[in-house]
Amino acid sequence: MSLIVKICGLSTPATLDVTLQGGADMVGFVFFPPSPRHLDLSRARELGAQVRGRAGKVALTVDADDATLGGIIEALRPDLLQLHGKETVARIREIKRTFGLPIMKAIGIETAGDLAALPGYAAVADRVLFDAHPPKDATRPGGLGVPFDWRLLENLAPGIPFMLSGGLTAGNVDAAVRTTRAGGVDVSSGVESAPGVKDAGMIGDFIRAARAAEINLREATSHVG
């Protein structure tokens, strides 16, 4: 199965176009006012129309209520909801029942103990996203450019679809994929020149590096034994 490459926190037509031209599989849009990447619904509608089926559209929300989710879905028409807050298993089940969209649940990782929540979330979410656990004084749950110890994921039970986030860059994505065998990689701050400011060159570099990482892992795996 091919590695999924997701560029998150896009907010301008120009950087979205670069991302689509570069061949990203998913494009992420943030709906969380404290984030420098936050979109209003008008801009979300505009950017969503620009995608035109060239990549999967992902709406990132944080503990959003049904009214907020409904407005986002109407504007963006996302293919996937990314829940990046403290949503419970019961809340995820409720969102799926109400809106009928696939869900990716973010889980913050700092220690092996943080993986205790995985079985419950994996039972209801379509995939999980492992991100670095935010510092206690953080105002946002993600997009902070902080990696975690990828070795914590080395012994995951097989069959759980997951993506990796947290401090990824063009320079470390190969090691991240090799260590975790993640099914996808998700980057935001790692392709920015300043918080919320995407850099076209960095986006292209990351996508190319992720594709190379996929090839390297496939070749390494084929040579084992």
From Swiss-Prot:
This is N-(5'-phosphoribosyl)anthranilate isomerase. The keyword NADP does not apply. Keywords: Amino-acid biosynthesis, Aromatic amino acid biosynthesis, Isomerase, Tryptophan biosynthesis. Pathway: Amino-acid biosynthesis; L-tryptophan biosynthesis; L-tryptophan from chorismate: step 3/5. InterPro entries: Aldolase_TIM, PRAI_dom, RibuloseP-bd_barrel, TrpF_fam. PANTHER family: N-(5'-PHOSPHORIBOSYL)ANTHRANILATE ISOMERASE. It comes from Nitrobacter hamburgensis (strain DSM 10229 / NCIMB 13809 / X14). Belongs to the TrpF family. The lineage of its organism: Bacteria, Pseudomonadati, Pseudomonadota, Alphaproteobacteria, Hyphomicrobiales. One of its GO terms (molecular function) is phosphoribosylanthranilate isomerase activity. It catalyses: N-(5-phospho-beta-D-ribosyl)anthranilate = 1-(2-carboxyphenylamino)-1-deoxy-D-ribulose 5-phosphate. HAMAP family: PRAI. GO terms for biological process: L-tryptophan biosynthetic process. Pfam families: PRAI. Its EC number is 5.3.1.24. Gene3D superfamilies: Aldolase class I. It comes from the Bacteria.
